[in-house]
Swiss-Prot record:
Record's subcellular location: Cytoplasm; Nucleus
The organism of origin for this protein: Schizosaccharomyces pombe (strain 972 / ATCC 24843)
Subunit structure of this chain's protein: Component of the DNA-binding general transcription factor complex TFIID.
GO BP terms: transcription initiation at RNA polymerase II promoter
Name of the protein in question: Transcription initiation factor TFIID subunit 2
Bias (Low complexity): 1145-1154
Family: Belongs to the TAF2 family.
Taxonomy, superkingdom: Eukaryota
GO molecular function, one term: chromatin binding
Protein's UniProt keywords contain Nucleus: yes
Sorted UniProt keywords: Cytoplasm, Nucleus, Transcription, Transcription regulation
């Protein structure tokens, strides 16, 4: 990154801007205070691109400067350049990322020995920015409220896209802002030209900016006729990071106002943000109870929510909890680092959360109305993390990019602790364990969370992985600090770190991994070197296989813990999302890292012995195999643990004698003889019960205190897992049991299905466990068990949610939110019921269709939009066979008739959603996905042509993004007109959200093509099956080769890499100045995968193009002379003037390979350039 030459990190910057909505222009001046430490300072370098620099002053004197726009510079202007020169452009990009620069200011005289501060003043303007600042509702076809906001992030070079500065996360300074804008919406809509602004009342104003900026403005009125509410006049508010100082009327234009802000806490330009528009506001601290207000006293912080009109109810409903989060963080981690907290909701932001000092800009997409249930947790977690990042992320920042994991880990960790207080310990531990299971799927061949060489800007998939693993690492570190070290753990470490920032002991507020570990070591008095090497700088995770045996002679439990991660390491799965990054790593010859052979550390083993007492044993793992001899403690008769609770003795019924007695446990529902017969329940037999009674202990839990991120499997009998599920009150233990029941190594039984059913119907269980039990019942729905799992699941659903002896559902009632979530989990489980051929039974499909057809939400106070989407998804999933059967799914006429019924029902819901839109049009989005899946499986007419109308402007943004993604998954890159259309949208669409989403969709589409196309091409003609053994063998070889990353790259190069139109369009998009830096970077990565780099260039020689010909001359008297005719010069056509791009007309014709053609010409030059 560029830096001010010899300028300390902390300085001061003043920014004065005038916002013109009509022309999407910002005109401004910035004053940067430079404190030189070199008396011979001759040049100052600032970061800036996408702006126009009009003049530069140093201490009031006009100064020479040079300016180079990175967006315009990052291109190859040579007209004969091709996509094969992508490596040359990539070198330019890497150089820019290391030192963006842009503005070079040449000092007329050095500061001298006095080293007085220099005031660098820059007059600049930004017209129709494509990155950094977003204007919404300005275009005539856009009927949303006009507003503008900064669209930056922690990623470098976002703020300098509209403001000259030293753009780096470590370049912190104090700030002042003067923002001039219209007072009201009617003033904003006024058409007359804006007068030149005097932003700083003369002295530091913009003097003589170019008139071209006035002449090039959009000459149109805002078209708001279709939105009657928009015609109401609203005050234009500006919300900025820092503190509001003053607001005055503009001295020259009474329709404008100037608002003043100050940021007294030094922050980097990445954390500078503002938003302006017709925002309303709500004081979210009004929801605080009076007693809570008194308890907080002077520590109470004001929280204000800003929103566009019509979002008042959604903001109140979504943010009602925020004052509790603020109070929690203040009590636990010290005073809030700023004076107030503001939350502003806007449209069209690429990031769900943009955190800056005292201000968070958030997307309207995280808001939800009162009748929506499914988004509650996700939105609550997102906003809680946004607030947590004020302490850790804005106030406390990483010292290097390799320390970024700490910021994500600590902020998400304290976010989770608040959610634990808000939603309960069971919810916290359950979700934490689910995150571990998710990590086990993803952390295969992944780099460490602390990477020395990380590519900037950081890939979103990498950030998501860091955000997932980092808080889990902090959690297990907390467990070890509190258990082994005997300290208060993170509850002491985090406040100490924040106190060091406040006191100035932590330089510039930058936290490094080494400093964090040293602080933890001081707090716990234990060394963390080994922990850091394994979990922070190491790869992978341990895989434990535990065996145990009770030795009756020695009265000990012999146990062996084997680490098998080097033997049973799962293969890294290929996916569409990860294909591009995997391909780049392959081309860089980066080997897939393997996990460590041995992970060491303490582990807690809890043995529930026969008397019902749990005994804990802490062991230290040091080797790949650890052998343990654990002393057995029980000397009394065992307590019968209620496996068959048919004849349950109540507490106290044993009359004080020493005989066995039964303790009631969870899952003791459906115990009567009538229930057992009606529900087809199976308990253990008397012989099995007697065998179980001889066991020395009830069950064993390894890693009982959740101190490890690991794949763990304990070898113990089925009935011990049943005891663990029914008698262990820890939701993690219950979740581990159900996960064991669904593992491939476990053989299910009718008794397990019975236990899962009772778990599902017992509302004393945490609802997440009931959901998992519902999903696990599908595992028991197999012919070998007479489909008992299906019978149990079906009976449970019909009993709870349908009319008696019918598959017609009752009217929806979602007032009990836990029952609603369990109901949804049961529906998700139905399509997983399969026969030996991978086909869902017809009764399951008919049940799901009835539930969809007869869904009734008339008497429900909550929306059923998500529920309908779930029904559609489950029904479509059930229709699609798995395994080899999918190839012949279209051959059954009866099944195809049922498929058509499903499509008709989906179309009905799409028509309803068009007339009465659901929340975010989610029904339309889900229906499009469902229809494409059916089309690809059953060879129906639904593909890019049918999806195209949904991609056009006027549709909801989410619908457009989904439609583009589905088009590319359906093979849109096979059609030349669609290739041109896609890249036109990628560089010219008004919506930054659509542009960014389309970029990632193109990457996913490449992954789909590389891994085997689009399942089956969508065809309108009858399918022709050719019984050709050779072709079948070739197809099998092609599928096998695409399974490896090298084979997938080669196949993609032979397919899409030979498409000249794609090569032309992607190269034009890369060289287009409208493409932002991230888009250029990702497209260059695609080029590297598709095309081999060539350091050669076609040279065009300016010589006449001549065509020789012969002519016959009749001399008379039968004499003919054949001579060489005068050479005719071919005039070259003049190139037409380039005009503004227009959307290409689209006629979808599949690209057909051309056959070989032999051409013979008499010419002195080739008409086409030679291949090279």
């Amino acid at each position: 990154m560029s830096q001010l030459v010899d300028v300390p990190a902390r300085g001061h910057q003043k920014v004065a801007i005038d916002i013109d909505f009509a022309s999407q222009t910002i005109i401004g001046r910035t004053d940067i205070t430079v404190n030189p430490i070199d008396s011979n300072l001759q040049k100052i370098v600032l970061d800036c691109y996408q702006a126009e620099i009009h003049s530069v002053y140093v201490n009031g004197d006009l100064t020479k400067f040079s300016y180079s726009d990175a967006l315009k510079k990052l291109r190859i202007d040579e007209p004969n350049s091709t996509v094969n020169q992508h490596h040359q452009l990539n070198l330019q990009y890497e150089a820019l990322m290391n030192d963006l620069g842009g503005i070079n200011i040449f000092l007329s005289k050095p500061p001298g020995d006095e080293l007085r501060p220099l005031i660098v003043s820059i007059d600049f303007s930004v017209h129709q920015p494509i990155f950094g600042i977003t204007f919404v509702g300005i275009d005539p076809v856009d009927h949303r409220y006009p507003h503008v906001f900064t669209n930056n992030s922690i990623i470098p070079y976002s703020t300098c896209s509209w403001l000259p500065c030293v753009d780096g996360i470590w370049e912190r300074s104090t700030w002042e802002f003067e923002i001039t804008l219209p007072k009201t919406l009617s003033s904003l809509m006024h058409r007359e030209k804006t007068q030149p602004s005097d932003l700083n009342n003369g002295a530091n104003g913009v003097d003589g900016h170019d008139d071209n900026y006035e002449n090039n403005r959009f000459d149109h009125q805002f078209n708001l006729s279709n939105e009657p509410d928009l015609l109401e006049d609203h005050d234009i508010e500006v919300i900025c990071c820092g503190d509001l100082l003053d607001q005055v009327t503009h001295p020259k234009d009474m329709r404008k106002k100037t608002v003043y802000f100050s940021v007294t806490t030094p922050v980097a330009p990445n954390y500078i943000a503002f938003a302006a528009g017709p925002f309303k506001h709500i004081n979210l601290t009004d929801f605080r109870e009076p007693e809570d207000d008194d308890a907080m006293g002077s520590s109470a912080i004001d929280i204000t929510g800003y929103y566009l009109p019509k979002y008042a109810e959604e903001v109140e409903n979504t943010c009602v909890f925020l004052y509790k989060a603020m109070d929690f963080f203040v009590r636990e981690y010290g005073s809030y680092p700023f004076n107030s907290f503001k939350l502003c909701f806007v449209d069209e932001t690429n990031f769900p959360i943009i955190s800056t000092p005292s201000l968070v800009i958030s997307s309207n997409s995280i808001l939800y109305p009162k009748d929506s249930l499914d988004q509650i947790y996700d939105s609550t977690k997102t906003l809680t993390w946004a607030l947590a990042s004020q302490w850790i992320g804005v106030y406390l920042i990483p010292k290097a990019w390799s320390d970024l994991w700490l910021i994500y880990g600590l902020s998400y960790y304290i976010c989770g602790l608040f959610l634990k207080k808000l939603m309960g310990n069971n919810d916290y531990r359950f979700r934490l364990k689910k995150q571990v299971y998710r990590l086990l799927e993803l952390d295969i061949g992944k780099p460490p969370i602390s990477q020395r060489n990380i590519n900037i800007p950081i890939d979103p998939n990498t950030l998501d992985f860091i955000a997932l693993k980092s808080p889990l690492v902090i959690h297990i570190l907390e467990r070890r600090l509190t258990k082994t070290g005997g300290s208060l753990g993170m509850s002491r470490v985090i406040p100490k770190l924040l106190l060091q920032v406040m006191s100035g002991d932590m330089l510039n507020g930058c936290l490094s991994t080494s400093h964090f570990l040293k602080t933890c070591e001081k707090a716990s008095h234990m060394r963390l070197d080994v922990f850091a090497q394994q979990w922070i700088y190491g790869y992978g995770y341990p895989i434990f296989r535990v065996v145990q045996r009770f030795n009756r002679k020695k009265m000990i439990i012999e146990m062996g813990i084997d680490q098998v991660q080097t033997k049973e390491a799962p293969r890294a799965p290929m996916s569409d999302k990860n294909f591009l990054s995997d391909a780049i790593r392959h081309l860089n010859n980066e080997s897939i890292p393997t996990g460590l052979p041995v992970f060491s550390g303490p582990m807690t083993i809890r043995i529930h012995e026969a008397d019902g007492t749990p005994y804990e044993h802490v062991v230290e793992l040091k080797d790949s195999f650890t052998k343990l001899d654990i002393q057995y403690n029980t000397k009394y008769k065992r307590i019968s643990r209620n496996r068959s609770t048919k004849n349950v003795k109540r507490d106290g019924d044993h009359n004080g004698d020493d005989s066995d007695y039964v303790i009631r446990s969870l899952g003791d529902v459906l115990q009567s003889d009538e229930d057992i017969e009606r529900w087809h329940l199976y308990d253990y037999t008397k012989e099995e019960e007697d065998t179980m009674a001889t066991e020395a202990f009830e069950w064993i839990r390894v890693d009982a205190d959740f101190e490890w991120i690991c794949d763990l499997r304990v070898r113990q009998p089925e009935h011990m897992y049943v005891s663990q599920l029914q008698q262990d009150r820890d939701v993690v233990a219950q979740l581990e049991t159900i996960r064991h029941f669904t593992s491939e190594s476990f053989t299910v039984s009718q008794q397990v299905s019975t236990v899962l059913l009772r778990t599902l119907l017992d509302n004393r269980y945490y609802y997440g466990i009931r959901q998992e039990a519902a999903r696990a019942l599908a595992r028991c729905a197999i012919p070998e068990l007479d489909w008992v799992g299906y019978y149990h699941l079906r009976m449970a659903y019909l009993e709870k949610f349908c009319f008696k002896d019918s598959t017609i559902p009752k009217s929806n009632d979602f007032s009990n939110i836990t029952e609603y979530y369990v109901k949804c989990a049961m529906l998700e489980s139905f399509p997983n019921i399969r026969d030996r051929k991978g086909v869902t039974p017809s009764s399951v499909k008919k049940l799901l269709l009835d539930l969809l057809c007869y869904n009734d939400n008339a008497n429900n106070e909550f929306s059923d939009a998500y529920f309908i989407c779930l029904l559609i998804d489950s029904l479509v999933e059930g229709l699609i066979p798995r395994g080899e059967t999918v190839q012949y799914a279209f051959s059954d006429p009866e099944h195809m008739e049922f498929v058509n019924q499903v499509i008709n029902e989906i179309d009905r819901y799409m028509r309803i959603d068009a007339c009465m839109p659901s929340f975010k049009n989610i029904i339309t989005c889900k229906s499009l996905k469902a229809k494409l899946r059916l089309a690809q499986t059953f060879h129906l007419e639904f593909g890019p042509k049918e999806l195209l109308p949904y991609t056009q402007e006027g549709n909801y943004v989410l619908v457009r993004c989904i439609a583009f993604n589905l088009m590319l998954q359906a093979g849109a890159l096979k059609y030349t007109p669609l290739i041109k259309y896609i890249f036109y949208i990628l560089t010219n669409d008004l919506s930054p959200v659509v542009r960014r989403s389309l970029l990632y969709s193109v990457q996913d589409g490449l992954g789909a093509l590389a891994r085997g196309g689009t399942k089956s091409d969508v065809a309108s003609e009858d399918l022709i099956v050719e019984e050709d053994i050779t072709k079948a063998v070739e197809k099998r070889i092609d599928i096998t080769s695409r399974a490896s990353i090298s084979g997938a790259i080669e196949a993609l190069r032979n397919d899409l890499g030979q498409n000249h139109d794609f090569a032309t369009e992607i190269w034009n998009a890369i060289n287009n100045p409208k493409s932002d830096l991230l888009t250029k970077r990702n497209l260059l990565m695609i080029c590297r995968v598709l095309y081999k780099a060539k350091s050669s260039l076609l040279v065009t020689l300016k010589i006449p193009s001549l065509i020789p010909r012969l002519r016959a001359i009749h001399l008379g008297k039968g004499k003919i002379v054949i001579k060489k005719a005068p050479l005719k010069q071919i005039t070259s056509k003049t190139k037409e003037k380039s005009t503004s791009p227009t959307p290409p007309s689209i006629t979808i014709n599949p690209i057909k390979p051309k056959g070989p053609t032999l051409k013979i010409k008499l010419t002195n030059l080739r008409s086409t350039p030679p291949s090279h």
